[in-house]
């Protein structure tokens, strides 16, 4: 009894040391372990991809989904603890989707005094005008969104755009490229855009989607569903997601093994002559 009381008091003290966004988080051992695990994954990505050398001001994309909310909260936590020496600017791009609740994100960000910018660009009409209803919108929508986020990052003097893609997104993209694109490619933890003036960072590349889902529910984020792409059936990414779920169900731990494989590439054991000089192999 006394030991449990001490543990509860310890968790309460630790909660007081967190960013204000965590003040409604549960004071439980389970949540504390989850938060620490996610922070550990992020710090590992920082180290593996030298993310902290990516400038002093980051634009963190906030869609209103579980992953971007979670990423923002965890980055703010690290900054609060003095472990992330960068300025953070949250940014939501309102793409003109019908029924998009315009008040939710500003209210959320203002309630915690989080620096932010809300930008309106009607890319929804562009996507629906250019594509017939049988085509998937995700690719074009993503390109338009990314272009606008690059512009905003430049206008705000940011050196990096930070995105909320997690481990499962990386694996789904890898298999989409493998099955449908005929190439070995996934999502890097860090890259430079085509213009060469902005970094793109993905601090959640080692974080499991399941953990992000649990974290989001515990934090009670006001989630905004994607009415544009979520209403379409038969998307390739959904098929990859279900395939990976089935693999993980039958062989637990395979997703982590796959991520390790993406960090352990042997060009000499593949068939791409651009990356290994087979001709001069004697």
From Swiss-Prot:
**Where can the motif PP-loop motif be found?**
63-68
Organism whose genome encodes this protein: Bartonella henselae (strain ATCC 49882 / DSM 28221 / CCUG 30454 / Houston 1) (Rochalimaea henselae)
Q: What function is annotated for this protein?
A: Catalyzes the ATP-dependent 2-thiolation of cytidine in position 32 of tRNA, to form 2-thiocytidine (s(2)C32). The sulfur atoms are provided by the cysteine/cysteine desulfurase (IscS) system.
Q: How does it assemble?
A: Homodimer.
Instruction: Cite the binding residues for [4Fe-4S] cluster.
Output: 138, 141, 229
Q: Where in the cell does this protein reside?
A: Cytoplasm
Instruction: Give the molecular function GO annotations.
Output: 4 iron, 4 sulfur cluster binding; ATP binding; magnesium ion binding; sulfurtransferase activity; tRNA binding
Q: What reaction does this enzyme carry out catalytically?
A: cytidine(32) in tRNA + S-sulfanyl-L-cysteinyl-[cysteine desulfurase] + AH2 + ATP = 2-thiocytidine(32) in tRNA + L-cysteinyl-[cysteine desulfurase] + A + AMP + diphosphate + H(+)
Q: Which cofactor does it need?
A: Mg(2+); [4Fe-4S] cluster
Q: Name one Pfam family in it.
A: ATP_bind_3
What is the designated name of this protein?
tRNA-cytidine(32) 2-sulfurtransferase
Top-level class of the enzyme under EC nomenclature: transferase
Similarity-based family: Belongs to the TtcA family.
Keyword Cell membrane: yes or no? no
């Amino acid at each position: 009894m006394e030991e449990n009381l001490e543990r509860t008091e310890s968790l309460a003290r630790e909660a007081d040391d967190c960013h204000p966004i965590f003040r409604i988080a549960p004071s439980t051992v389970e949540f504390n372990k989850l938060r620490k695990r996610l922070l550990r994954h992020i710090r590992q990505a920082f180290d593996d991809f030298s993310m902290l050398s990516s400038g002093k001001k980051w634009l963190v994309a906030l869609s209103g989904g579980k992953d971007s909310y979670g990423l923002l909260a965890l980055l703010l936590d690290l900054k609060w603890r003095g472990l992330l020496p960068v300025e953070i600017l949250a940014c939501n791009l309102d793409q003109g989707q019908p029924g998009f609740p315009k008040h939710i994100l500003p209210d959320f960000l203002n309630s915690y005094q989080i620096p932010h910018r809300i930008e309106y660009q009607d890319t929804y009409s562009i996507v629906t005008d250019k594509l017939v209803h049988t085509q998937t919108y995700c690719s074009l929508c993503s390109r338009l969104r990314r272009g606008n986020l690059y512009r905003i990052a430049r206008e705000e003097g940011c050196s990096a755009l930070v995105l909320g893609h997690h481990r499962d997104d990386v694996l789904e993209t890898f298999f989409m490229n493998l099955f449908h694109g005929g190439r070995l490619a996934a999502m890097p933890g860090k890259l430079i855009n085509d213009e060469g003036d902005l970094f793109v960072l993905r601090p959640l590349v080692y974080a499991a989607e399941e953990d992000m889902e649990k974290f989001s529910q515990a934090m009670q984020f006001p989630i905004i569903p994607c009415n544009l792409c979520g209403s379409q059936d038969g998307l390739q990414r959904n098929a990859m997601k279900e395939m990976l779920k089935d693999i993980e169900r039958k062989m637990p731990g395979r997703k982590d093994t796959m991520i390790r494989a993406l960090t352990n590439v042997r060009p000499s054991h593949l068939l791409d002559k651009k990356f290994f000089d087979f001709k001069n192999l004697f």
